[in-house]
Amino acid sequence: MEGQSVEELLAKAKQEEAEKLQRITVHKELELEFDLGNLLASDRNPPTVLRQAGPSPEAELRALARDNTQLLVNQLWQLPTERVEEAVVARLPEPATRLPREKPLPRPRPLTRWQQFARLKGIRPKKKTNLVWDEVSGQWRRRWGYKRARDDTKEWLIEVPGSADPMEDQFAKRIRAKKERVAKNELNRLRNLARAHKMQMPSSAGLHPTGHQSKEELGRAMQVAKVSTASVGRFQERLPKEKAPRGSGKKRKFQPLFGDFAAEKKNQLELLRVMNSKKPQLDVTRATNKQMREEDQEEAAKRRKMSQKGKKKGGRQGPSGRRKGGPPSQGEKRKGVLGGKKHSRPPALGGKKKGVPHHGGKRRK
């Protein structure tokens, strides 16, 4: 029994070792192409096993992927290794397969105004050397920048032009001109950036006119500006004949949380009475008077507009020889006099008007 058990153990160990070798060693009819720089293995063998697998080749696909991965790992173990911070690493070679880009190619930079002008006129840039001979110092110096040749800022004497003011400081004028050139270059640079990003420039994106503002809008804007201080307009100075602003602010009075149950009951009952009452809440007299006032204002605005047009036309005459905007002739009828109705609405309820008999009542404001 002991001999059989030893033989069985040896056979089992031999079988396990063979299985391990079988897992590591993979045989292929055609050798795989490896690109170790990208950790890529290309299998050119025909997939005969997959064709025989039928409609569900998942197991065959897993086995094929495992074999190809094993071959790739075997190639990695053949690479030279080195120790980096107590870790053994393998240095991969340069990749041989060119992979596609993750992102699209960068767009070309938009041309500046000078580049567009140069392309239009056919101007080609000429390459200049950085160093030039300076006759004053007798040595080679830079063409631009610090310690450049023919540096006029280092001159201690400046000739005053004949057309210039003899009392003007030419040194300060030169510094001021240089600052203006720097500011102009910066403005052109910002314009090029805005043109490249398709932004709207301040010249065309500034504040636009809001049209004519009425008296109410101006008063509201003035009131808002006055209460925009830290003291909410309490210590704001007023003009000599300026009126106090109406409705500038009222403190909200809250009812007590506990105590006055009678007043609370009264308010709730009043609210229920108003909600359950069938009487309409609209004041007909007030609504009618408001409508009449609006119509009067519209007609007054129209008459004012017509009178302004007549003043603008002046002494210009029509084809009949009569001045435009002048009084009508005897044969014509005036609008709003006998023969025409001035208003097509009923008289005001309880109101008072010129030329209309008063029927009593007061006009509510």
From Swiss-Prot:
Q: Which PANTHER family match?
A: RIBOSOME BIOGENESIS REGULATORY PROTEIN (PTHR17602), RIBOSOME BIOGENESIS REGULATORY PROTEIN HOMOLOG (PTHR17602:SF4)
Which keywords appear in this protein's UniProt record, sorted alphabetically? Acetylation, Citrullination, Isopeptide bond, Nucleus, Phosphoprotein, Ribosome biogenesis, Ubl conjugation
Which residues are recorded with the post-translational modification N-acetylmethionine?
Answer: M1
Functional description taken from the UniProt entry: Involved in ribosomal large subunit assembly. May regulate the localization of the 5S RNP/5S ribonucleoprotein particle to the nucleolus.
The record's region (Disordered) falls at 200-255, 272-365
Record gene name: Rrs1
Q: List modified residues, type Phosphoserine.
A: S5
Q: Where is this cross-link: Glycyl lysine isopeptide (Lys-Gly) (interchain with G-Cter in SUMO2)?
A: K154, K226, K266
Name-wise, this protein is: Ribosome biogenesis regulatory protein homolog
Subcellular compartments: Nucleus, Nucleolus
Its lineage opens with:
Eukaryota, Metazoa, Chordata, Craniata, Vertebrata
| GO CC terms | condensed nuclear chromosome; endoplasmic reticulum; nucleolus; preribosome, large subunit precursor
Protein family membership: Belongs to the RRS1 family.
